[in-house]
């Protein structure tokens, strides 16, 4: 009592304490960063290596494998995947959550150094690494377009000036430039002209290499002066290479222009980028794993004027895609929902108390508790995100509960004629333990969440801590500020009601009287209530097993990402046409605002597209509905598929795929993997639970297999090296020389002019100069025939891997899909040499599914322990926890009614219900025990009186929690797919719980009291210990 009196009789100190809490919260709010979700990105590092011209199999065996063996020894690597394609290898290392990305980067560099001696000597550069996840969607895409400059020149500006500057901005992890390649001088050779002049391709290569050198020439000095020697040893443009003499034939000079077309072009012509219908260079910016997306985007935007000033005015630099607007809009929606929740909760208090003066008290207590939470959030390193703001929205109903319980009890004493200060002290003393029990037991619900590991634990931690802090501050406020305000603001007389509120008061009285009559009947028919209670427990189990489940609600972020997968033998020209066709289909959709895409590089049969949808207010369909509509149109395009998926704020894993979920096949037997993967993929494609089934196994590319006749080669004076060099010179876009410029280095690229390589007959025009100087056609010593070859080779760990990706059709859940895949694998009889497992988000879903029931049981057990300690009883916690089955049934039925799968967000709702619904029982049990101890009442009389006496605060607290969650259910706009499952779960659980626990709790209380008496050593004792 002294504790309460300290604050009740010292109003100035109490007010200043509350002001201090509020000011700290305001200061913390202003410094909190903004993010879509808590920081849950896995530390990811990408290692890249190249060996131009090497086949995917060569890259996998000679480059990827040595690097994987060295990188796999690094501590904290949770997943290692690699993909090797023509001339390049990319290895993705995913680390444990607690691994520092900078320390991991140092270990990666050390591992690369250790493997260096095992790598091929012909690699043009050492392997490099980047601290970014290539499978993440870019946080921003910039485009460069121009009517004046060529694509190569635009690429040069992007890669030389813009990308390095952007990479230095805090939070930026990687800037990937696509759509073309660096400028180059391209030498397109005419095979027939070469043959006529007796010039080999090696002759051309050697002549160009020798004519373009950059070597130090030294200095000249005399007694007084010093001169640096400079020569015209470099050729920089196509016009300078054109007259270069490469050979003499019968005394006549053969110039490069006589046997080749020399142009100023780009290093790799097999690249294309577009924005809407215009050729463009794309700068795809990804953030560091630990970076804040909003802060990073804002920093980039702040530098854009400076970046624009560094490039010519004829180049248009535009933002094609920006993730931040939808994130900001989503957070604004949550903030509005929070304000509405506060207003509704205060309205509930006003209706029940029917006094403006009394309503002011919770109207002050709620903001103080919520605002003060921001200070703790800042100290914990949290952010303003959807989950933390949802925690505060839900906390509105919780924090007002404490104030309501105290206020209502004090108001009851005032209505009985007690003086205000005395009523404040007496009323607070009576319910102080009740408020403490409710708050501590509610916080106890979240202890298992705080101990939960992995991505779900990291994701829920901010929610749990934020809500717990809000409840803790609310507990302090309700026992200090609330009784002080009651003592000094409320009057001893019964408050005057407005005429419009008298009807509500009479309705409440009638409702209480009706409840009393029905409760008497229930207490006389306890067996029926027991059957109902057991039925709800069984119904909980059945509903949980049968309800569709998923990991996280599908978000509508306003951004779609698409992967193009074409026939494996498609040419680059045809692939570029497919990109244009797909972009036109998407651009014509009324819901699309902007579309960018690119294709080319080492995988000519694939491409990527990034689609920005119009804001939610300007379109009626969700992202998934738009995808469903576009899927029908895109399916009509022959020879290629475009798989669309909505970009999510949570993506697990580093392997790039064309769909949201992955199922990975592993095998140490590559032949077995290549045999079974098509069978499994075709089977999965028939399942109605899956959509957009595709695979990264690309083992059916067209190959022209040349077989050398070594005996003939020896007789003709030709070695294999010369023959291979011929093919590389002719068809490999071989970089044969370097042009040095002040800002960058450019290449001279040699190949047979594409005009002469339109079909297989181009091989017949190739020849080698033998050791006698004679031109020997390739067909003299080699035969060729078409064959199949892999376009890529994938590993996971050190095993061969193939990942099958899939999306979910509308109306299907991830649990449906995973169960269907497991059944299909069993039906196919896949051998033990091929192992299948879910990857990425689907893998985390499997792990979460296995721990959900354990987590709920742990939460219930923790609450039981806390209540047992508080009540010094084994029995009363069971009475209080008997309220949970009805809440579970209500929550699961509500999810079924709204066709919402059981997700991680719904699990949060279930955990919250464990904390919410037991409050009713706590208020009943506390007053029943008090009545038995001091009122000499029988258990039945005590619990009956407690139920009637606490009916008004029970209704107030339940309706406050319900109205606090109702805006989450009714909210629309950005981010509503995250808010609605939480609101649906809580509202459904509260409604069902309120209908049943007002009757089941008294019955359970009496049951355990009789049970206690039966086994008690003191049967005559009537007051519960």
Curated annotation (Swiss-Prot):
TM region(s), chain numbering: 3-23, 333-353, 360-380, 387-407, 431-451, 463-483, 528-548, 853-873, 875-895, 897-917, 953-973, 984-1004
Induction, per UniProt: The mdtABC operon is transcriptionally activated by BaeR.
Family matches, as SUPFAM superfamilies: Multidrug efflux transporter AcrB pore domain, PN1, PN2, PC1 and PC2 subdomains (SSF82693), Multidrug efflux transporter AcrB TolC docking domain, DN and DC subdomains (SSF82714), Multidrug efflux transporter AcrB transmembrane domain (SSF82866)
Membrane topology: Multi-pass membrane protein
GO cellular component labels: plasma membrane
A GO term, aspect molecular function: xenobiotic transmembrane transporter activity
Subcellular locations according to the entry: Cell inner membrane
Cleavable signal peptide: none
Main location: membrane
Keywords (A to Z) from UniProt: Cell inner membrane, Cell membrane, Membrane, Transmembrane, Transmembrane helix, Transport
Keyword Lipid biosynthesis: no
Entry function: The MdtABC tripartite complex confers resistance against novobiocin and deoxycholate.
Annotated family: Belongs to the resistance-nodulation-cell division (RND) (TC 2.A.6) family. MdtC subfamily.
Oligomeric and partner information: Part of a tripartite efflux system composed of MdtA, MdtB and MdtC. MdtC forms a heteromultimer with MdtB.
Protein name listed in UniProt: Multidrug resistance protein MdtC
Organism name: Escherichia coli (strain SMS-3-5 / SECEC)
Name of the gene this protein is made from: mdtC
